[in-house]
Swiss-Prot record:
Active-site residue numbers: 274 (proton donor/acceptor)
Residues that coordinate or bind acetyl-CoA: 240-242, 247-253
Site positions (Interaction with histone H4 N-terminus): 197
The protein's Enzyme Commission number: 2.3.1.48
This protein's name: Probable histone acetyltransferase type B catalytic subunit
Principal location: nucleus
Classification of source organism: Eukaryota, Viridiplantae, Streptophyta, Embryophyta, Tracheophyta
CDD domains hit by this protein: NAT_SF
Keywords from the named record: Acyltransferase, Cytoplasm, Nucleus, Transferase
Function: Acetylates soluble but not nucleosomal H4.
Length: 466
């Protein structure tokens, strides 16, 4: 970690006198504004601003409650992470330091908290490109190749390798932790000492003799096998990450497909994902919908539901229709495809949408009405009105427009306790907020349906006719 303090004119000329004055309280600088993180794939990229830049979700949260750094003028923190060994080197420069009332932030412990033992000095960092290149080869050699995709480049190939999180593989995971902390919001390192952890690595093998390393890690997934009563195993995807230089190339898709293949071949009970991001859920639902499109057991129930949405008139609310599959069908899907019930219900709505004519106003209104009823039931339950659940929009530090709270009101009690009465205007606001949630979910369904359509036109041809 290099610290560089730039000289000033006053320091260069001792005859110049500084004027005495009183400066204001140091406002500090946000870490997001002065810190950048790069990936270096070779020694030439180390220390270069031309390296691939990472986009951490939020660097501020590493620097105290307000996310600011104090006591530095024109502070710049540039960190390079080796794509070979995942060691890190930090270059820190500033013009001067001064205590403006908030102290001077000690940068070293904060960076060590992020990068741990990966953080080294520049000379050692440069040596890791040649000295550390074999350890990844050892991890890959000890693992099992699950999937092999020939690359468009003649000198390389992409493989997915399955390794147990112990020994060298556990050591590799520890080196990947800083990337997880930087790029996955709300993430925490897994406990690799716990039984049942393994990792799927997306690696690129180089056939070039001049390459400093035989393999590059493009991405990975950490999965956990845990007991399910009475005598089966569930598989949970805890973390999945494709490194920024290789995102958009389909590696995350390959990881999920490989996990699905493992779950079927080993008769896992089902597959779940721990706190998936919106984009990961988008990819997951697209994959599962494509699998379900060719799963014959769902077609009779799916076509029946599509037909009901075409024929029923829900606009006047004189009738109701629950857009749910038969319970035995959800169990069949779990047994054969290892899709858990919650995920299947999500995909079920997308499959129905795919089989409706978007130009048929009646069908689409009925579809939206079913989505509305489901969401209203999930949020408010069956008890609404003067004494029941209520949905209100609440400001938050994350998003003032899309955060809601649910609370319960009831009749009776002291007058002082009845601080909330549901007036007509309250019901109108609640209806508006419910519709906003419904609109958001409708947008998600439409986007996933578009992706499924673009990737599976041949599979859609054998679905229910519209």
């Amino acid at each position: 970690m290099a610290l560089k303090q730039k000289g000033t004119d006053a320091a260069a000329d001792p005859k110049k006198r500084r004027r005495v004055g009183f400066s204001g309280i140091d406002a500090g600088v946000e870490a997001n504004e002065c810190m950048k993180v790069f990936i270096a794939r070779n020694p030439d990229e180390a220390g270069s601003a031309n390296s691939t830049s990472l986009q951490p979700f939020d660097l501020n949260h590493f620097f105290g409650e307000d996310g600011k750094i104090y006591g530095y003028k024109n502070l710049k923190i540039n960190v390079w992470i080796s794509a070979i060994s995942f060691h890190a080197y930090a270059d820190i420069s500033f013009e001067e330091t001064s205590d403006g009332g908030k102290g001077i932030t000690d940068l070293k412990p904060v960076l060590q908290n992020i990068f741990g033992e990966n953080l080294v000095e520049k000379d050692e960092f440069l040596k890791t490109f040649s000295k550390e290149c074999e350890y990844l080869s050892n991890v890959v050699t000890d693992g099992n190749v699950i999937k092999h995709d020939a690359s468009i480049d003649e000198d390389s190939a992409v493989e997915i390798v399955r390794v147990e999180l112990q020994g060298a593989a556990a050591f590799l995971y520890c080196r990947l932790v800083p990337l997880i902390l930087l790029l996955v919001e709300g993430s925490t390192p897994i406990d690799i000492t716990e039984h049942g952890w393994e990792m799927l690595l997306v690696v690129k093998k180089s056939a070039q003799a001049s390459s400093s390393s035989n393999f590059l890690v493009l991405g990975f997934a950490a999965v956990h096998h845990f007991y399910h009563y009475p005598e089966s195993t569930r598989l949970r995807i805890s973390q999945i990450l494709v490194l920024p230089p290789y995102q958009g190339e389909g590696h995350g898709l390959r990881l999920l497909e490989t996990i699905n293949s493992i779950s079927e071949s080993e008769n896992i009970y089902d597959v779940t994902i721990e706190d998936p991001s919106d984009y990961l859920q988008y990819i997951r639902s697209s994959i599962d919908c494509l699998r379900l499109l060719t799963f014959d057991p769902i077609k009779p129930a799916l076509c029946s539901m599509v037909s009901s949405l075409k024929d029923t008139n829900l606009s006047k609310r004189t009738s109701s229709l629950k857009m749910v599959p038969p319970s035995d069908l959800a169990e069949t899907v779990r047994q054969k495809l290892k899709i858990n019930k919650k995920q299947f219900l999500r995909c079920w709505e997308i499959l129905i949408y795919l089989n409706l004519d978007a130009e048929d106003r009646k069908s689409m209104d009925n579809f939206r009405a079913c989505i509305y009823d489901r969401i209203k039931g999930e949020i408010l339950g069956t008890s609404t009105g003067p004494n029941g659940k209520r949905l209100v929009q609440m400001p938050s530090n994350f998003d003032e427009e899309t955060c809601f709270a649910v609370y319960w009101t009831q009749d009776g009690g002291d007058a002082d306790d009845q601080t909330v009465e549901q007036q007509p205007e309250d019901l109108k606001t609640q209806e508006q907020q419910l519709n906003e949630v419904v609109d958001s979910q409708m947008e998600e369904i439409v986007e996933i349906a578009k992706n499924v359509t673009s990737r599976g036109k041949d599979k859609l041809s054998v679905s229910c006719s519209v």
